[in-house]
Amino acid sequence: MDLKKAALDYHLFPKPGKLSVESSKPCLTQQDLSLAYTPGVAEPVKEIHKDPSNAYKYTNKGNLIAVITNGTAVLGLGNMGALASKPVMEGKAVLFKRFADIDVFDIEINAKTSDEFIQTVVNIAPTFGGINLEDIAAPECFYIEKELKKKLDIPVFHDDQHGTAVVVAAGLINALEIQSKKLEEVKIVFLGAGAAGCSCARLLKSMGARNIIMVDRQGVLDKNRSNLHEINIDLAIEPSAIKTLDDAMQDADVFIGVSAA
């Protein structure tokens, strides 16, 4: 099978894209439409105005997630821009719907700065019951997530961090059990120190892992490196002779690859 052709055809036919919007209420008669829109729609508007929590009662807010990106870290492709990231965001929406029956709007934001991105999300947040951040480059992603959690009253989840970390932790627990090894005793090497790698390592540390070495394209993260951000520094080892991936892999028990390199 020609994978490229199959993937492009899948996205093109029978109509472009992977998502559509369907009504959850009957809209066949004049009476239906007068309830769906004016004049009937004014009644839930007034109820929500009196008590904002009624939005969860009379609208789809409680089952609607925003999958949001700026396209700066798309899959292993890098900074592809907001528009080119749309197929991935639609794909994540499909997963939400297929496996949890949660509705999604995919939103791709052209933002020049992290603060501009944050403000855009804050401005549209009333529509949604939760925010799923996706494919945002590190270290900006850490700041964006932290600020949105401060500003919003709905859940904020960065999939590349937390989704990956949960899956990696679950897999490692099972693998270590099969090998009769303990998390606090094994040597773990990460290739990749971006959003996914850092989040995985932080979760494993919180679970008891003590010997973790992070490696990125410039080598081992140690505290002598001047180009580390605050999350990297927290995971960096003390300066030593361990400088490369080959060095780090000596006597390693676990290798976790979270890099396109």
Question: What is each of the regions a protein language model found here?
Answer:
Residues 144-151, 242-251, 261:
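Rossmann-fold NAD(P) dinucleotide-binding segment
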Residues 134, 257-258:
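Short, well-ordered coil/turn residues at beta-beta hairpins
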Residues 22-27, 106, 110, 177, ...:
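Short, exposed beta-strand "edge-strand" segments with a Pro/Gly-rich flavor and a Y/T-containing core
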Residues 75, 82-100, 158, 162, ...:
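Glycine-rich phosphate/diphosphate-binding loop of Rossmann-like nucleotide-binding domains
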Residues 49-54, 199-200, 240-242, 261:
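Glycine-rich, charged/polar anion/phosphate-binding loops
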Residues 1-156:
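N-terminal ligand-binding/catalytic initiation module
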Residues 139-142, 198, 258:
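Transmembrane alpha-helical segments of multi-pass membrane transport proteins and ion-pumping complexes
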Residues 26, 110, 137, 161, ...:
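Short beta->alpha junction loops/turns
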